[in-house]
Amino acid sequence: MVLIQFLTGFFYLYGKRLFSVSKVMDMICLDYYTILPAPLAMMLAARVKNYDLMKKLHEWEIPVDYALLVVDDVPTIDYCLSLGANSPTRAQKRRLLRDTTFNPVYKYLMNCSGFPTKREKNIPCDVQCERLQKTIIKELVFNCSVLLEMILLSEKEYAYALHYAAKYNQLPILMYCWQQSTNAESILLKTCCSDKNINCFNHCILYGGAQNLNAAMIEAAKHDARMLINYCVMLGGKSLNEARETAIIFGHIECAQHCSRLQSYVMRD
């Protein structure tokens, strides 16, 4: 809940959302900074030119060198140098960026905030940012869910994150995105069934309740997810006929036969 409240305050920088200075200050200086990778905390503070926060992080022995990776204005660079930062060489930058936890966010800040790479200079900024958002959602969102509000800007992006949260069984992210996406139930069912993912499926039933078992069986039949059909029947699902017909429509003959066998067992009981 603290995180959700924290994420309510942010402002726009170069057309992209970032945390408000006060909220970054509140979060990090109240010992919540451990949620963020330490280098990323310094980067964000530098990006919003919060010198007080940079100094506080520096006192906590978080290297100010990281700030120089994401700033290009003279006052901020001078401030970093006054704190003892060394302008990173190429080799040092490679070393600093070896931490894959915050590497996608670094790329996001650089490419979406006025620092396109040489290779991408001719690619429109909005296209670059869309690609990087997908990278972040895939690679980072599961390590640092506090950044969700910063990078998810639309219903479509929440749906995308929900899909990956379900795919990789990331329950905290699934819970957050579930609240933001109007199509959450359908996305979860499709993801769980297509990946034949029983843990994801459990979350789906947990959120949607037993009334979704019949819809889940039909969705499972579309993907030949026989294990999930078995699971639905065990929990009280009643749509075996519909599941069998769906399996036939989608060309899953063995799945249709499986549904018929299950139907005979259920009727026998």
Swiss-Prot record:
Expression is induced as follows: Expressed in the early phase of the viral replicative cycle.
Highest taxon in the source lineage: Viruses
Q: Which UniProt keywords apply?
A: Early protein
Instruction: Relate the protein's function as given in its record.
Output: Plays a role in virus cell tropism, and may be required for efficient virus replication in macrophages.
- Family, per entry: Belongs to the asfivirus MGF 360 family.
Q: Output this protein's name.
A: Protein MGF 360-15R
